[in-house]
Amino acid sequence: MKLVRFLMKLSHETVNIELKNGTQVSGTIMGVDVAMNTHLRAVSMTVKNKEPVKLDTLSIRGNNIRYIILPDPLALDTLLIDDEPRKKARAARAGASRGRGRGGMRGGRGGRGRGRGGPRGGGPRR
């Protein structure tokens, strides 16, 4: 299971988050999106070497998060169960498994609409 999918299941849990700049944030998770952006409510934020600040809500950009410290009584075994069904491998499509290089339905570089002019070497000289 991906980390983000696990974090998405943590709604309504109270966590401590440490940011890359040293700020400590404590609050209740309202939601986490696929970019790990985390939305909290009832937040206490302590900027490094400053006094704590109380906030109603706070959104944290995912790439600023260093640690998420989970509460001890959290039932990890139930949260880590991957309940998303696996995607089945698609059947090989015609032309899809042609190996490396260019190539689609009509082949590599040729095909219709190849550009200006006719045959290589130009047309007749006048």
UniProtKB/Swiss-Prot annotation:
It comes from Caenorhabditis elegans. It comes from the Eukaryota. Pfam families: LSM. It is found in: Nucleus; Cytoplasm, Cytosol. GO terms for cellular component: catalytic step 2 spliceosome; commitment complex; cytosol; P granule; pICln-Sm protein complex; precatalytic spliceosome; SMN-Sm protein complex; spliceosomal tri-snRNP complex. Plays a role in pre-mRNA splicing as a core component of the spliceosomal U1, U2, U4 and U5 small nuclear ribonucleoproteins (snRNPs), the building blocks of the spliceosome. Gene3D superfamilies: 2.30.30.100. This is Probable small nuclear ribonucleoprotein Sm D1. Residues 86-126 are annotated as: Disordered. Residues 2-74 form the Sm domain. SUPFAM superfamilies: Sm-like ribonucleoproteins. Its main location: nucleus. Belongs to the snRNP core protein family.
